[in-house]
Swiss-Prot record:
Membrane topology: Multi-pass membrane protein
GO terms classed as biological process: adenylate cyclase-inhibiting adrenergic receptor signaling pathway; G protein-coupled receptor signaling pathway
Higher taxonomy: Eukaryota, Metazoa, Chordata, Craniata, Vertebrata
Positions bearing carbohydrate: N16, N27
Record localization: Cell membrane
Disulfide feature: C114-C195
InterPro entries: GPCR_Rhodpsn (IPR000276), GPCR_Rhodpsn_7TM (IPR017452)
Compositional bias per record (Low complexity), positions renumbered to this chain: 316-325
Segments crossing the lipid bilayer: 42-67, 79-104, 115-137, 160-184, 201-224, 433-456, 466-489
Name listed for the protein in its UniProt record: Alpha-2B adrenergic receptor
Extent of Basic residues compositional bias: 333-344
Disordered: annotated segments: 234-284, 300-385
Function text: Alpha-2 adrenergic receptors mediate the catecholamine-induced inhibition of adenylate cyclase through the action of G proteins. The order of potency for this receptor is norepinephrine > epinephrine.
Gene: adra2b
Length: 510
């Protein structure tokens, strides 16, 4: 085998040790040392250069978008700024030297820079995944402890957390500076200088676990917990009433008050149609609506009822409908109530959408109820617009009153709309971060797994060198993917990027 040139290869007019020109043997060795053909070298260099440009430009756009867009100015997005800065450093300080080392087949630069280069490579890669781990923990705290954690999530605290992330990354990447196993080459052996990854077993296990596997496990567990919490809140959102039971179901027992102040449980069967309670023919709609009920969900807050005359107790019945009374007394009472109908207002109960406005309801157990028939009402607040709005769903009929059961309307105040928009933005942001973490794991797992095999079984588990290099460069590709993910999956970033790129650049940042 021809011996390689004793010093740096590829310099024009290079002389040998005797002062003459390079020998044909040296020139042949130079050709043999080239790892790729000229065509492959040009294609590889073009692809990696394009990747570097996308990484730098895309992550600069991310930083500008977070710092200038109102919808992205939350303190938690400072994590994305730091993550984008790490990706920019990878594209400017790591990938160019890795590309030169790959295409030339040896380390052209000084050995001191090799030490710094390897340490920075591990530092930036570790900081990326530790950033993602910190972001996932921040997501979990904001979802599980929204009330207490929200006020604590200040820009100052987030910046302190980012500083801790970089310190942890530095602790993991610092040992290579103490113990490096580099193949410097040169000297008497004539070998070319190399700058390779540390192949000491202790450091391989230390760096792979600290830089990838431990943070990856934390992120997976945290996002599993986030998914469980989100699923629970989808079924029963906090602060909202539970959904109504199906129309053919039996409602739980309700407690209604009779004229003596006793609480009597009653069970009503829901029908397929809206529930209607028949009332006595001698009672008007207004009388039926004036029955005092314990549940006052629809009752005007300023309305006061004072029962004066109890109704006669009807016979026990297991039905929710009461037979009409045909007494003369009732007819007189009916005429009297018709004359005073403008003085009274309906006050139905809205317990789970059931109408309980009959003046002669009976409990299911068979005991009759005395319900007051002539309550008096204080005039304050009865005819206010708010009170009229509450009874919009009441439909008066000749036999009584019928309530159309429907779900309570959502609060339409600006605060609730703002809160809903914030919750939706948090959901979208959580989904985008889940995609970012998933892509990161897919890109870097093959490299870290194959690298750890060198410590576990260096001889039997060794991968082919081309495959290991492929995994190595796939990991670097992750640095340019985050801006693409933000653009595809988050409309806030998409809107911010469009605003940055399409606005008039006169007098602006550019």
């Amino acid at each position: 085998m021809d011996s390689p040139c004793p010093v740096a290869v590829g310099l024009p007019g290079h002389t040998n040790g005797t002062g003459g020109t390079s020998s044909p043997t040296c020139n042949q060795s130079m050709i043999k040392l080239a790892p790729y053909s000229p065509e492959a070298t040009a294609a590889f260099a073009t692809a990696i250069t394009l990747m570097m440009l996308i990484t730098i430009v895309g992550n600069i756009l991310v930083i500008i978008a977070v710092l200038t867009s109102r919808s992205l100015r939350g303190p938690q997005n400072l994590f994305l700024v730091s993550l984008a800065a790490a990706d920019i450093l990878v594209a400017t300080l790591i990938i160019p030297f890795s590309l030169a080392n790959e295409l030339m087949g040896y380390w052209y630069f000084r050995s001191v820079w090799c030490e710094i280069y390897l340490a920075l490579d591990v530092l930036f890669c570790t900081s990326s995944i530790v950033h993602l781990c910190a972001i996932s923990l921040d997501r979990y705290m904001s979802i599980s402890r929204a009330v207490t954690y929200g006020p604590k999530r200040t820009p100052k605290r987030i910046k302190c957390a980012i500083l801790v992330v970089w310190l942890i990354s530095a602790v993991i990447s610092f040992p290579p500076l103490l113990s490096m196993n580099k193949n410097k080459g040169g000297g008497e052996s004539g070998a070319l200088p190399q700058c390779q990854l540390n192949d000491e077993r202790w450091y391989i296990l230390y760096s792979t676990i600290g830089s990838f596997f431990a943070p990856c496990l934390i992120m997976i567990l945290v996002y599993m917990r986030i998914y469980q919490i989100a699923k629970q809140r989808t079924r029963c959102p906090p602060g909202e009433p539970r959904k109504e039971a199906p129309a053919n179901a039996t409602t739980p027992q309700h407690k209604i008050q009779n004229g003596r102040g006793d609480e009597t449980p009653g069970t009503l069967q829901k029908k397929a149609r809206p529930p209607t309670l028949a009332v006595s023919q001698v009672e008007s709609v207004q009388q039926a609506a004036n029955t005092p009920i314990a549940n006052n969900l629809l009752q005007a807050p300023s309305t006061t009822l004072t029962p004066t005359t109890p109704c006669p107790s009807p016979s026990p019945s297991n039905s929710s409908e009461v037979a009409p009374s045909k007494s003369k007394e009732g007819k007189k009472e009916k005429k009297k109530k018709k004359n005073n109908k403008n003085k009274n207002k309906k006050e139905p109960d809205n317990n789970n959408g059931e109408s309980m406005s009959s003046d002669s309801d009976t409990e299911q157990g068979g005991r009759g109820l005395e319900v007051p028939c002539t309550p008096t009402m204080t005039p304050s607040g009865i005819h206010s617009p708010a009170t009229m709005q509450k009874y919009r769903d009441m439909i008066a009929t000749a036999k009584g009153a019928k309530l159309v059961a429907r779900k309570a309307k959502q609060d339409g105040t600006p605060n609730s709309a703002r809160r809903k928009a914030m919750v939706n933005r948090e959901k979208r942001f959580t989904f985008v971060l889940a995609v970012v973490i998933g892509v990161f794991v897919i890109c870097w797992f093959p490299f870290f797994f194959s690298y750890s095999l060198q410590a576990v079984c260096p001889e039997s588990c060794a991968l082919p060198e081309p495959l290991f290099k492929f995994f190595f460069w796939i990991g670097y590709c992750n640095s340019c993917l985050n801006p693409v993910i933000y653009t595809i999956f988050n409309k806030d970033f998409r809107r911010a990027f469009k605003k940055i790129l399409c606005k008039n650049t006169k007098g602006t940042f550019f």
